Amino acid sequence: MADDPFVLGDTPFSSRLIMGTGGAPSLDILERALVASGTELTTVAMRRVDAGVHGSVLSVLDRLGIRVLPNTAGCFTAGEAVLTARLAREALGTDLIKLEVIADERTLLPDPIELLDAAETLVDDGFTVLPYTNDDPVLARKLEDVGCAAVMPLGSPIGSGLGIRNPHNFQLIVEHARVPVILDAGAGTASDVALAMELGCAGVMLASAVTRAQEPVLMAEGMRHAVDAGRLAYRAGRIPRRHFAEASSPPEGRAHLDPERPAF
C-alpha cells in the first residue's frame, strides 16, 4: 500500500511476505506458490545455489522478477557467515543478506554472540543485514544498534510450526524497534502470520509452512491474505480486552415493562 510502505535498507516493497525456497516438492510447485504468495523477495541458501544451472531456483526467481535474498544458513561461526555473505555478494551482486549463525544442528537456534559479531562486521562492510535472531528484546536492540536494517526474531524453532510462543516478547521488540521487525521461523498456518502482523511486525518470513503444506499453492495464497489482514487490523487498532461484556447498542429506546402489571 502506497500509504504504508515496507522498506528494507533503501529498497521499498509492496509485499510484506518474504518467502523461502527450502523443502518445496518440486520447482514447478515452488514457482506456483511464489506467484500465489505475491512475494517480491525470496531467500535462498548460498550452499544450495548453482547460478549456472538452467532450471534452478535462481532461474525461477529471475523469470518471475523476484529479488533474491541470499542467506548464510548452515553457518556456526561469525567467520563462516561473513565469508558466505561476501561470496553471495560476489556471485549475486546484492548487498542484501539474511544473516543466520546457528548454535547447533538440533535446535537451529541462533548463537547470539556469533550473530552480533557477524552483524557488526557485515554492516561495516556495506551489507544490508537482516539477522535471524532469538525473541530477545535486548539482543534485538543490540543488533539494531550495530546497524542492522531489520531484526528477524523467531516465533518458535525453524520448521516446528508452533507459531509465536512468546507474543509478549514480540510486542516488546516491536515497541522499542526503530527498524522493521519481521517474524522469522515457526509459522505453521495463516493464523500465526496474522497474529505476527497484529502484534506489529512489519513483515513475515516463512518457508516450511508453505512448502510442506498439503497444498503449498493454496497455503501460499492464504499466507498472502493473512499478512494483509493482520497488517490492516494492526493499523486499525483492536478494541481493548475486557473481563466483562460491553453492549454495542446504547440503552436508549429499550422496552420497559411496569413491574406492577403482568406482561400479558
Curated annotation (Swiss-Prot):
GO terms for cellular component: cytoplasm. Residues 253-264 have a biased composition (Basic and acidic residues). It catalyses: [ThiS sulfur-carrier protein]-C-terminal-Gly-aminoethanethioate + 2-iminoacetate + 1-deoxy-D-xylulose 5-phosphate = [ThiS sulfur-carrier protein]-C-terminal Gly-Gly + 2-[(2R,5Z)-2-carboxy-4-methylthiazol-5(2H)-ylidene]ethyl phosphate + 2 H2O + H(+). Gene3D superfamilies: Aldolase class I. The active site is at residue 98. GO terms for molecular function: thiazole synthase activity. 1-deoxy-D-xylulose 5-phosphate binds at residues 159, 185-186, 207-208. InterPro entries: Aldolase_TIM, Thiazole_synthase_ThiG, ThiG. Pathway: Cofactor biosynthesis; thiamine diphosphate biosynthesis. One of its GO terms (biological process) is thiamine diphosphate biosynthetic process. Keywords: Cytoplasm, Schiff base, Thiamine biosynthesis, Transferase. It is found in: Cytoplasm. Pfam families: ThiG. Its EC number is 2.8.1.10. Homotetramer. Forms heterodimers with either ThiH or ThiS. Catalyzes the rearrangement of 1-deoxy-D-xylulose 5-phosphate (DXP) to produce the thiazole phosphate moiety of thiamine. Sulfur is provided by the thiocarboxylate moiety of the carrier protein ThiS. In vitro, sulfur can be provided by H(2)S. This is Thiazole synthase. It comes from Streptomyces avermitilis (strain ATCC 31267 / DSM 46492 / JCM 5070 / NBRC 14893 / NCIMB 12804 / NRRL 8165 / MA-4680). The lineage of its organism: Bacteria, Bacillati, Actinomycetota, Actinomycetes, Kitasatosporales. The gene is thiG.
